[in-house]
């Protein structure tokens, strides 16, 4: 739900299993819930089976995220209490598909902290400095259900941690 409009411009990119054209012009997509909606405060449940309905939810979330010019979105933001995140830091780069994270778990974070301004598609127009670890190591399943690990730093680490907060009913304004 990080909202960096300058980073999210119109373009198209495809993933092998979660194919969604990029840009603001999207077909009907789920509404993003905003601050005050009880859905944003409920913890999400683990996804027990990765199947086509999970992939379709990821596609719908990507459409909503691209429409809103965001770079990340969590399922609770569209009213679905499942542990699913979509992230696309560079919507203009067709060579890199969006990242789909199912049941993400933090394995480790760096001791080093960074402060950076964040925004959220669920809290439009509000930007605040948030302190987060500069690096994160996570484990998750991808859209095919494969177990994966990923180390991230910089903006990717921040985006992953921001979106994972949504899975626990935490918003960046709580930080």
Which residue ranges define each predicted feature?
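Positively charged
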Residues: 2-175
């Amino acid at each position: 739900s990080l909202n960096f409009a300058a980073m999210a411009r119109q373009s198209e990119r495809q993933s092998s299993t979660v194919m969604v054209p990029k840009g603001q012009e999207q077909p009907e997509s789920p509404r993003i819930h905003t601050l005050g909606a009880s859905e944003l405060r409920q913890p999400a449940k683990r996804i027990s089976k990765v199947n086509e309905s999970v992939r379709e939810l990821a596609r719908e979330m990507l459409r909503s995220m691209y429409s809103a010019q965001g770079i990340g979105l969590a399922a609770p933001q569209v009213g679905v209490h499942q542990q699913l995140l979509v992230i696309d830091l560079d919507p203009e780069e067709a060579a890199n598909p969006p990242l789909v994270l199912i049941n993400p778990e933090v394995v480790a974070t760096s001791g080093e902290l960074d402060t950076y301004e964040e925004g959220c598609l669920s809290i439009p127009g509000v930007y605040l400095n948030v302190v987060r670890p500069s690096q994160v190591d996570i484990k998750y399943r991808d859209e095919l259900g494969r177990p994966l690990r990923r180390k991230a730093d910089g903006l990717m680490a921040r985006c992953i941690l921001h979106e994972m907060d949504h899975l626990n009913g935490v918003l960046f304004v709580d930080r």
